Amino acid sequence: MGAELCKRICCEFGTTPGEPLKDALGRQVSLRSYDNIPPTSSSDEGEDDDDGEDDDNEERQQKLRLCGSGCGGNDSSSGSHREATHDGSKKNAVRSTFREDKAPKPSKQSKKKKKPSKHHHHQQSSIMQETDDLDEEDTSIYLSPPPVPPVQVVAKRLPRPDTPRTPRQKKISQRPPTPGTKKPAASLPF
């Protein structure tokens, strides 16, 4: 069962067992082991910001514990694999430094640094939304041009310019049509 969970975790990171785990930016993720640290130990400091992340964190850590040494992404610098046990006598929790992991909550000092950035992000996103709205108004002008009436092409025959004709051409044009060129309609065969 441990190997199956290991495969699931490796699939979550987008790698196969035996390959190092990498985050979304392509950096190698090191899985570290730590002993006897409850998953909610650092979350006691900041309970006012609890969004149910502890439940997700515990589930993820449980999966990582069951994975044990079957993962190929364990800390590659040490070369040794630690095994997780299910009996509770010795539990090695494997925690990832991957950004999407629900790691234990940071200390109060780092929260103070993050709060202004969240507020700034909110201001920035609202400003971006306003500029997007303005952009939509501006681009709507350009995206829908006024309808153009269809152009009707009228073929007008321009009069032929007067060209100097030779006396022979003038004579030919003044002659009446010859009877051989005109055929009567009654003589047509069916």
From Swiss-Prot:
Q: Report biased composition (Basic and acidic residues) as residue ranges.
A: 80-90
Gene of this entry: UL99
Q: What does this protein do?
A: Plays an important role in the cytoplasmic envelopment of tegument proteins and capsids during the assembly and egress processes. Also participates in viral entry at the fusion step probably by regulating the core fusion machinery.
Q: From start to end residue, where is composition biased (Basic residues)?
A: 108-123
Would the keyword Phosphoprotein turn up in this protein's UniProt record?
yes
PTM note says: Myristoylation and palmitoylation (probably on one or more of the nearby cysteines at the N-terminus) enable membrane-binding and Golgi apparatus-specific targeting and are essential for efficient packaging.
Q: Which domain of life is it from?
A: Viruses
Against InterPro entries, the record matches this protein to: HSV_CEP3_betahv
Q: Where would you find this protein in the cell?
A: Virion tegument; Virion membrane; Host cell membrane; Host Golgi apparatus membrane
Mode of membrane association:
Lipid-anchor
State whether keyword Phosphoprotein applies: yes
Where is this chain primarily localised? virion
- Could you identify this protein by its name? Cytoplasmic envelopment protein 3
Write out the GO cellular component annotations: host cell Golgi membrane; host cell plasma membrane; membrane; viral tegument; virion membrane
The GO annotation for biological process reads: viral budding from Golgi membrane
**Record keywords:** Host cell membrane, Host Golgi apparatus, Host membrane, Lipoprotein, Membrane, Myristate, Palmitate, Phosphoprotein, Virion, Virion tegument
Lipid positions (N-myristoyl glycine):
2
Question: What's the subunit arrangement here?
Answer: Interacts with cytoplasmic envelopment protein 2; this interaction is essential for the proper localization of each protein to the assembly complex and thus for the production of infectious virus.
Q: Which family does it belong to?
A: Belongs to the herpesviridae cytoplasmic envelopment protein 3 family.
Q: Spans of biased composition, class Acidic residues?
A: 44-58, 130-139
Task: Quote the biased-composition stretches of kind Polar residues, using this chain's numbering.
Answer: 30-43
Q: Which residues form a coiled coil?
A: none
Q: Where is this region: Disordered?
A: 27-190
